[in-house]
Amino acid sequence: AESYERIVLWFEHDIYDQAVLIRLLDHFEQHPELHDRLYMITLDRFPGIARFNGLGQLSPDQLATLWGSERPVTPAQRQLGVAAWRAFRSGNPTGLGTMSERNDLALPYLAAALRRHLQDLPWTRDGLSLTQRLTLQAISEGAPTPGKCFGALVNQLEPQPFLGDLMYWPIVAELARASEPAITPVVTWQSPVALTPLGKRLLDGTADWLTQNGINRHHGGLQLAMPGAVWRWDGVTGSLLRA
């Protein structure tokens, strides 16, 4: 980076991009010699595109129209990046919860992205992450294969698309391979898929995924493991709960 006159950061609004952005801002904060060379292009919509999922939707000509809209990265944005990256790596998600509730952050899309990140914690109603529940919903609404589920999430159901197919597949596989699966076995993107009796009860809100299968995974810097209390997302109050 030291050899360039300007460094322009191009980032979308989703949690995948925003997480990379705060990591970079944390890094650049430690390099004051680069501060006056940092610029940013960031967006959550584009004229003529009804459902903007990201820069990958844009043609070369459309991308070219964004050049010139870059703005200098401010000290407040760098400092927010440092604080947000620290919170993202923390084993306690309450700092992220606080940031996700603010509407005055120096990075305009960060709060919504962090909220979407927290929504992929297990929910209090059924122990599912939002991505897991939307997958079951897609199947219940007629998606016949994992590939069609992914398409339904990206194009319709997901409020803030951020998962690529390689990131999404392990989520589908877990739903199928758990001790008490929520969907029928899948091997490829084209495998026929259907809800199991547990999957139907999960969608009805009469079963809990963690009660049936437990959990042991990381979500950012937070380790979710049972036995013991696990951080969950309360979809009614829009807040975190440890239970």
Question: Predicted segments — roles?
Answer:
Residues 1-30:
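Long, hydrophobic/aromatic-enriched structural stretches that serve as scaffold segments
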Residues 17-25, 49-54, 162:
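A short acidic (Asp/Glu
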Residues 40-65:
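Short, conserved secondary-structure transition motifs
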Residues 60-140:
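A conserved mid-domain beta-alpha-beta active-site/ligand-binding segment of alpha/beta enzyme cores
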Residues 134-142, 152, 171:
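Short amphipathic alpha-helical elements of helix-turn-helix/winged-helix folds
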Residues 142-154, 164:
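Short acidic, hydrophobic short linear motifs in intrinsically disordered regions
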Residues 155-169:
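Short, positively charged loop/turn segments that connect secondary-structure elements
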Residues 166-169, 181-243:
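Accessory beta->alpha helical hairpin/"wing" motif in late/C-terminal subdomains of nucleic-acid enzymes
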